[in-house]
Regions:
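Hydrophobic transmembrane alpha-helices that form the pore/transport pathway of multi-pass ion
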Residues: 8, 12-84, 268-298, 350-352
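Membrane-embedded translocation segments of transport machinery
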Residues: 178-252, 256-271, 277-282, 292-296, ...
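Transmembrane helix-loop junctions in multipass membrane proteins, especially transporters and channels
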Residues: 25-29, 75, 81, 105-121, ...
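Juxtamembrane and boundary regions of transmembrane helices in multi-pass small-molecule transporters
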Residues: 84-139, 298-354
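Alpha-helical transmembrane segments in multi-pass membrane proteins
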Residues: 9-17, 21, 58, 92, ...
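Hydrophobic alpha-helical transmembrane segments
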Residues: 2-5, 33-49, 91-97, 154-168, ...
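Helix-loop-helix junctions within the multi-pass membrane cores of secondary transporters/permeases
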Residues: 13, 17, 36-43, 48-49, ...
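Hydrophobic transmembrane alpha-helices of multi-pass small-molecule transporters
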Residues: 119-232, 333-341, 347-348, 352-354
Length: 354
């Protein structure tokens, strides 16, 4: 789909990652699409940071609209005593977050200079550090279709499994594999099936640009993300205490509190469970809580989240880079615009349904 419509990659990329997260209940499904997004954008002459940034943001905010995500299931249970049911929550969150992603994509489409005018890109191009894949050079192997079907089948299985083990569906109780572990296991099994059934020379895999980018991203995820979460986990109680005290004095600041808390807690579910009960207990209106729910998706602010780091590493043009001031990275503005739009739309839609 992305390869067939390269000219609109900045808008189609977040649609794909949003829908995948919506169905699977986890943003880690975006890992499989990031290399394709980067390659298609580069081939079209589009600055890869534009579609990559909003695609990552879409994969994060879609958690607050996914029927099977832990954050939505937990929040729905909290809202039930206040007369807001599960379906009403979804009826508000799904359209508002999707429209917000499209607004964010529109903003991202104007971020940064054109790729051909980027000095970093030109420097890397001169040094031969960028691999350009043109249509003339692309050779489609006869087994490509089979490999694609295996890959799509694996994604479909992951989505179904995530739904089956979720609290809202509950077909599988006490699953042996959690959602994230299942994604890794199934996708590795799919990779093995592709290698064996399509008779791929395994020795050539480490030389592939996508494999090198992916492994580099793995190292970044293991190191930087682990380090960041270690620091934050040591101060979780303090974060909750400060946020709770702020909400008690200023209930209207719920969206801001959730934004900054999720930035540190690295989890939509953890932020929801930590702060939403306190917010509802001190008298925050259900409409305000539902409208502010999207703000628990500010995982892009600190550039240490796995999908964000993967996007940076998979863009060999250098357009998706983290600035020396930490916060000046291409994910920040589209992310803030998307969350702000989702909250504003949440009040509009929520006012009609609650």
């Amino acid at each position: 789909f992305l390869r067939k419509h390269p000219e609109r990659i900045t808008f189609y990329a977040p649609i794909v990652t949003f829908l995948m997260t919506l169905m699977a209940g986890t943003g880690h499904t975006a890992f499989s699409t990031l290399p394709v997004i980067a390659e298609v954008a580069k081939g079209q002459g589009v600055r890869p940071s534009r579609p990559l940034s909003i695609a990552v943001v879409a994969s994060q905010i879609a958690i607050t609209a996914s029927p099977i995500s832990a954050a939505v299931v937990a929040f729905a249970a909290m809202l039930h005593p206040f007369g807001v049911d599960y379906l009403t929550l979804l009826a508000i969150c799904i359209p508002t977050t999707f429209i917000a992603c499209m607004i964010g994509a529109f903003v991202a489409n104007f971020m940064g200079c054109e790729l051909k005018d980027d000095p970093e890109y030109q420097e890397r191009l001169e040094k031969g550090l960028i691999k350009l894949n043109t249509e003339a050079k692309r050779e489609i192997l006869p087994t490509a279709k089979k490999a694609t079907f295996i890959f799509l089948g694996a994604i479909a299985f992951v989505v179904c499994y995530a739904a089956a083990i979720s609290g809202s569906v509950g077909l599988i109780e006490n699953p042996a594999l959690g959602r994230n572990e299942a994604i890794m296991t199934v996708m590795l099994a799919a990779a093995a099936a592709i290698v064996m059934s399509c008779k791929i020379d395994a020795g050539k895999i480490p030389a592939a640009a996508t494999f090198r980018s992916g492994m580099t991203a793995c190292v970044c995820v293991l190191g930087v993300a682990w380090l960041g979460s270690t620091f934050v986990n040591a101060h979780v109680d303090g974060i909750k205490e400060v946020a709770g005290a702020l909400l008690a004095d200023y209930p209207w600041m719920l969206a801001l509190v959730l934004f900054f808390a999720s930035m540190l807690l690295y989890s939509q579910g953890a932020t929801t469970v930590a702060l939403m009960p306190a917010a509802l207990a001190i008298g925050v209106a259900p409409l305000t809580a539902v409208a502010s729910f999207a703000a628990v998706s500010a995982l892009f602010v600190l550039p240490t989240y796995p999908t964000l780091l993967a996007a940076v590493e998979m863009d060999d043009t250098g357009s998706t880079r983290i600035g020396k001031y930490v916060f000046n990275h291409p994910f920040f503005v589209p992310g803030v615009v998307t969350i702000a739009s989702a909250v504003a739309l949440g009040f509009a839609f929520g006012g009609l349904l609650i």
